Amino acid sequence: MEQFHGTTIVSVRRGDKVALGGDGQVTLGNIVMKGGARKVRRIYNNQVLVGFAGGTADAFSLLDRFEAKLEKHQGNLTRAAVELAKDWRTDRMLRRLEAMLITADATTTLVITGNGDVLDPEEGICAIGSGGAYAQAAARALAENTELSPREIVEKSLEIAGDMCIYTNHNRIIETIE
């Protein structure tokens, strides 16, 4: 059976502001199954943003586990991410999950990879998913050459990725913490 795949999630941090956004397309093979999926959410009393890419069921499973880790560690984003990554590497069932997460709070942005790695992005910019490289390149160029806000950079980056990646559409959901 084919896997659901394809999306773009991008995050930009500037100063004390962070934006995290994603498109809404869910693709199965060469068919668009849904155009308005919500892949970016606020969790932990609206203090943490999370976006996910990869297999839909896998992503939701990881999201649930990540929320539980946040609760256990009183909202400490880094600790929750590291603990999730440890579980991901040691649990046989989790190792089979094909998904990635970007998480952000008021001070920290992290990428949690399918290998169980936790990455702190350079220059406060990161992206995942099939259109991630397009969005990240656009975000870096915009951040280096404009005074746009993180939200504006995320919006424009997703627009560019949607123009270039067949698995990314223009239905965007963007969340911010300021």
From Swiss-Prot:
GO BP terms: proteolysis involved in protein catabolic process
Database matches in InterPro entries: ATP-dep_Prtase_HsIV_su, Ntn_hydrolases_N, Proteasome_sua/b, Proteasome_suB-type
Residues forming the catalytic site: T7
Cellular component GO terms, alphabetical: HslUV protease complex; proteasome core complex
PROSITE patterns in the cross-refs: PROTEASOME_BETA_2
GO molecular function: metal ion binding; threonine-type endopeptidase activity
Swiss-Prot/TrEMBL catalytic activity: ATP-dependent cleavage of peptide bonds with broad specificity
Binding site for Na(+): G162, C165, T168
Keywords: Allosteric enzyme, Cytoplasm, Hydrolase, Metal-binding, Protease, Sodium, Threonine protease
Broad enzyme group: hydrolase
HAMAP family hit by this protein: HslV
Protein name (record): ATP-dependent protease subunit HslV
Source organism (scientific name): Burkholderia lata (strain ATCC 17760 / DSM 23089 / LMG 22485 / NCIMB 9086 / R18194 / 383)
Recorded name of the encoding gene: hslV
